[in-house]
């Protein structure tokens, strides 16, 4: 076995230390360290199991409600950590009938649960939520929930990551049966993790309540909000042209001018773009929250700026 050069090993160690120092701040035994809490939020169907990442420091903090998809195998905790590092509280939760939360699962229950969690944030006096700086971030079916939740006036901006516009399943079937079949397969597979529902029942609900569930139904209030939509050219689950573009067009038709869209050569879970997507999301929300000044005109160029359309 070839021995590694000790000088090279030391150099690699120093490089690692430098990267850690750039990315991570160590707080030691300060009075208000970053922390993590498991929270049970009372919902209309019982307990909503939630996790809260709190940022360092006294006082209130800008807050992100992070919404996972269906069934939620990808919960984007790395994104939660990235947002906390720059000063956000991040609250994520499991929908009714999902991953231990009480009740039965349904698409309309997802929307109601998100409203319940937002109301919890607005009424809480314990954890230091800044009630004037609340944002929503959602991935996949969580992007659908995020879009609907961001219509609430208390939400100041939103981020949709590979969103699933579940209310458009019928229209998508007319445009691409292959894409629609993929959504049906996801619903069927996801039902194994969900209480009180089948894939067929979810599909029926999506079609029966399509007008209420489609993201375009929220276009008018969303036209007044800063919104970032990130899609992937290799995403075969929720291709942006079927799931994101119709919402963007509807918002623009309502006069919306606060949209940003990004597209990367990656899959539905942005598996090889995790750090890039996290950087783009944090940069977008930092600017909205006033944590950092706008990048425009600074003389430096964001890694996220190249793909903005």
Region locations from a protein language model:
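Primarily recognizes the serine-hydrolase "nucleophile elbow" in alpha/beta-hydrolase
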Residues: 123-127, 131-180
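Conserved alpha/beta-hydrolase
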Residues: 84-100
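The serine-hydrolase catalytic nucleophile loop
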Residues: 69-81
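Catalytic active-site module of serine/aspartate enzymes centered on a nucleophile-bearing elbow/loop
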Residues: 264, 270-309
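N-terminal cap/lid segment of alpha/beta-hydrolase-fold proteins
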Residues: 17-58
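Catalytic nucleophile-loop/oxyanion-hole region of alpha/beta-hydrolase
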Residues: 71, 98-131
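The alpha/beta-hydrolase serine catalytic core
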Residues: 155-157, 161-258, 262-271, 277-278, ...
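Short beta-strand element of the alpha/beta-hydrolase
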Residues: 60-69
């Amino acid at each position: 076995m070839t021995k590694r050069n000790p000088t090279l090993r030391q150099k690699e160690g120093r490089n690692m230390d430098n990267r850690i120092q750039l990315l991570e701040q160590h707080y030691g035994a300060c009075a208000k360290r970053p922390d993590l809490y498991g929270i049970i939020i009372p919902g209309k169907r019982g307990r909503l199991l939630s996790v809260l990442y709190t940022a360092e420091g006294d006082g209130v903090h800008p807050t992100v409600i992070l919404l996972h998809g269906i069934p939620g195998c990808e919960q984007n905790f790395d994104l939660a950590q990235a947002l906390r590092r720059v000063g956000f509280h991040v609250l994520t939760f499991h929908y009714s009938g999902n991953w231990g939360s009480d009740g039965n699962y349904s698409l309309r229950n997802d929307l109601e649960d998100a409203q319940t969690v937002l109301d919890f944030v607005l009424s809480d006096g314990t954890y230091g939520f800044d009630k004037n700086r609340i944002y929503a971030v959602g991935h996949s079916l969580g992007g659908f929930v995020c879009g609907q939740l961001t219509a609430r006036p208390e939400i100041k901006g939103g981020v949709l990551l590979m969103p699933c516009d579940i209310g458009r399943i019928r229209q998508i079937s007319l445009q691409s049966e292959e894409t629609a079949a993929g959504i049906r397969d996801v619903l069927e597979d996801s039902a194994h993790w969900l209480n009180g529902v089948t894939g067929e029942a979810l599909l029926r609900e999506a079609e029966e309540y399509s007008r209420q569930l489609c993201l375009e139904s929220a276009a008018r209030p969303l036209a007044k909000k800063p919104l970032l939509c990130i899609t992937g050219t290799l995403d075969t689950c929720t291709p942006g042209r079927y799931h994101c573009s119709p919402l963007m067009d509807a918002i623009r038709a309502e006069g919306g001018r606060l949209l940003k869209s990004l597209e990367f050569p990656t899959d539905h879970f942005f598996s090889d773009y995790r750090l890039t997507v996290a950087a783009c999301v944090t940069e977008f929300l930092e600017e909205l929250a006033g944590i950092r000044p706008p990048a425009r005109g600074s003389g430096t160029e964001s890694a996220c700026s190249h793909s903005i359309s």
